[in-house]
Regions:
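S-adenosyl-L-methionine
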Residues: 1-23
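A short SAM/SAH-binding and catalytic strip from SAM-dependent methyltransferases
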Residues: 22-43
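Short catalytic/ligand-binding loop motif for oxyanion handling, primarily in non-cytosolic enzymes
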Residues: 34-36, 71-74
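A short glycine-rich, Lys/Arg-flanked "PGG" loop and its adjoining helix->strand segment in the class I
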Residues: 42-61
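Class I S-adenosyl-L-methionine
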Residues: 71, 77, 81-127
Length: 127
């Protein structure tokens, strides 16, 4: 029932958070860094997923939304193969359908005009 907002690079904040404290993390329409030479700037990286796994409670959710298919493939490839996360999708409609309890952003509204919208959800294993 508590909420905190951090208006800066979350990667700086993650190491300071208490392990197992967070129930849900949203990454909504982050910069896809489409040029290959910039992929190291993407938020979803192995070390970032390690930090998310550390702070998420067992059964906690990491939700990722994008309108960039390359970015979606990148995040899916890393998170689905991470030992601490399980992709929750049961079928194609699961990743095409926005979460019922989601929060729209201005970038999502912009993305709705395009052909691609991807909503990925990963559950923290354990517990």
């Amino acid at each position: 029932d508590n909420i905190r907002l951090h208006d800066d690079d979350a990667r700086r904040l993650l190491p300071r958070l208490t392990p197992g404290l967070i129930g849900r993390v949203y990454l909504l329409y982050s910069d896809p860094w489409p040029k290959k030479r910039h992929w190291n700037r993407r938020f979803v990286q192995r070390d970032t997923l390690d930090q998310l796994a550390r702070i998420l409670a067992p059964g906690g959710l990491f939700r990722f939304a994008t309108d960039h298919m390359g970015h979606a493939r990148w995040a899916l490839g890393l998170a689905a193969n991470h030992p601490d996360f399980q992709w929750t999708a049961q079928g194609p409609e699961d990743w095409r359908t926005r979460w019922a309890d989601g929060y729209p952003t201005r970038y999502e509204e912009k993305g709705l005009a395009g052909p691609h919208r991807v909503y990925l959800e990963f559950r923290r294993r354990g517990g």
